[in-house]
């Protein structure tokens, strides 16, 4: 899948160590979001979307980009172009299919990634699909496509766009065992207030919808 045609012209700081930008993604007719972790003057990009050159320069003023981490092949986005732009490595899941270029490093669940990130296998959207957990301070979870912003809360991607919706819900349930106070999705703003409660509400809503007569 090629990059979105639009570029983000700026980014915002959820916290000093957590940057965010987004675009209206013409490929999927939905909003898409990207994140970056800043630690000790180094920046790790997560599923990066296109950034306009002034925004790239502003990003570099925050620190030195050192790596790109992908949660799955459906989130390649601008990874390969930014790899060349910054001269950094791309980390991608083992056995990810459909990658447009070869990643520098393949990762599996539980290994240490740059920036203190740890991959958590989160199948359902696809089989080779990962969340990234940052166990620093209050904790941050980058949940990729397991949960997305729907209206005022969290929800799930329509079942027809998932490999296995039941496994997606199970992945969401397993997130509740992790330590995090901020939840970051590939499609939506950060959830900074009681994100685990937001996950529980999404699961409860999905269960009610599943019981509703057709």
Predicted segments — roles?
Residues 80-121:
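Helix-adjacent hinge/juxtasegments
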Residues 2, 19-20, 25-26, 42-45, ...:
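Metallo-beta-lactamase
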Residues 1-35:
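Short, compositionally biased "basic patch" segments
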Residues 75, 96-97, 190:
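Alpha-helix capping/helix-boundary segments
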């Amino acid at each position: 899948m090629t990059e979105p045609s639009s570029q983000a012209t700026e980014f915002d700081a959820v916290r000093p160590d957590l940057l965010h930008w987004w675009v209206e993604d013409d490929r999927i007719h939905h909003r898409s979001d990207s994140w970056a972790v800043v630690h000790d003057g180094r920046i790790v990009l997560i599923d990066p979307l296109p950034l306009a050159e002034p925004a790239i320069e502003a990003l570099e003023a925050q620190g030195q980009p050192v790596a790109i981490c992908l949660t799955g092949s459906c989130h390649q986005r601008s990874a390969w172009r930014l790899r060349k732009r910054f001269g950094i490595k791309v980390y991608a899941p083992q056995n990810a299919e459909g990658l447009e270029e070869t990643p520098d490093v393949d990762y599996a669940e539980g290994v240490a990634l740059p920036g203190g990130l740890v991959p958590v296998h989160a199948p359902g959207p696809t089989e080779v699909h990962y969340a990234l957990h940052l166990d620093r301070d209050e904790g941050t979870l980058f949940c990729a496509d397991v949960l997305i912003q729907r209206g005022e809360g969290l929800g799930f991607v329509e079942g027809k766009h998932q490999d296995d919706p039941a496994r997606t819900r199970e992945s969401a349930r397993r997130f509740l065992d992790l330590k995090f106070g901020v939840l970051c999705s590939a499609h939506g703003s950060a959830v900074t207030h009681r994100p685990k409660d937001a996950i529980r509400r999404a699961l409860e809503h999905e269960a009610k919808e599943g019981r509703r007569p057709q």
